UniProtKB/Swiss-Prot annotation:
GO molecular function, one term: gap junction channel activity
Segments on the Cytoplasmic face: 1-23, 98-112, 192-205
Protein's name according to its UniProt entry: Gap junction epsilon-1 protein
The UniProt record lists the keyword DNA-binding: no
Extracellular side: 45-76, 134-170
SMART domains in the cross-refs: Connexin_CCC
UniProt subunit comment: A connexon is composed of a hexamer of connexins.
One Pfam family named in its UniProt record: Connexin
Family (UniProt): Belongs to the connexin family. Beta-type (group I) subfamily.
Keyword Isomerase recorded: no
Length: 205
């Protein structure tokens, strides 16, 4: 019986009841994971080692880098954002697997439809919060020069630091923000698809 639960859970996660949900999981989600795993770590892999300030002292470089990048690397935050957004859907499919609910029944029975819509709304909320945090922490652009306030180190001045591969990081930020925006739009479109199919279903009976 436990193997059947695992099978139902896997099928629910891989093949959600909506067409848009399937597109997000199988196609768009895969592209986003590939983008994070391959390009993200290639751009941010050795950022701390190449972050150099003037004067070039280890403690100054480390202090200013921590000030410049509050969460390191930025790819980790993006990966965490992706996982958190997927949690509500995974919990719903776990519930459906434990109740032995077929994917076809989710949009046919009102109680299951409401629960699924709530999980999508929760995904939208989490994605919006993560998007706001991403913009607040990282912005939309990475500049080549960072001015570090090093007064707490006893350096009574603003220290200039060079940011490595700033152009590539800017492109990565734009891409991540675009992915997040598309994700939110897909979740909203999924709700409209559910409503349409719920309204259309009685006419097929």
């Amino acid at each position: 019986m436990s193997l059947n639960y695992i099978k139902n859970f896997y099928e629910g996660c891989v093949k959600p009841p909506t067409v848009i949900g399937q597109f997000h999981t199988l196609f768009f989600g895969s592209i986003r994971i590939f983008f994070l795993g391959v390009l993200g770590f290639a751009v941010y892999g050795n950022e701390a080692l190449h972050f150099i300030c003037d004067p070039d002292k280890r403690e100054v470089n480390l202090f200013c880098y921590n000030q410049f990048r509050p969460i390191t690397p930025q790819v980790s935050f993006s990966a965490l954002q992706l996982v958190i957004v997927l949690v509500p859907g995974a919990l719903f499919h776990l519930y459906a697997a434990c109740k032995s609910i077929n994917q076809e029944c989710i949009l046919q029975k009102p109680i299951y439809t409401i629960i699924y819509i709530l999980s999508v709304l929760l995904r939208i909320s989490l994605a919006a919060i993560a998007f706001w945090l991403q913009i607040y922490l990282f912005g939309f652009q990475v500049k080549s020069l960072y001015l570090c306030d090093a007064r707490s180190l006893g350096e009574n001045m603003i220290i200039r630091c060079m940011v490595p591969e700033h152009f590539e990081k800017t492109i990565f930020l734009i891409a991540i923000n675009t992915f997040t925006t598309i994700t939110i739009l897909l979740f909203v479109a999924e709700i409209f698809e559910i409503i349409f199919r719920r309204l259309y279903f009685p006419f097929r009976q």
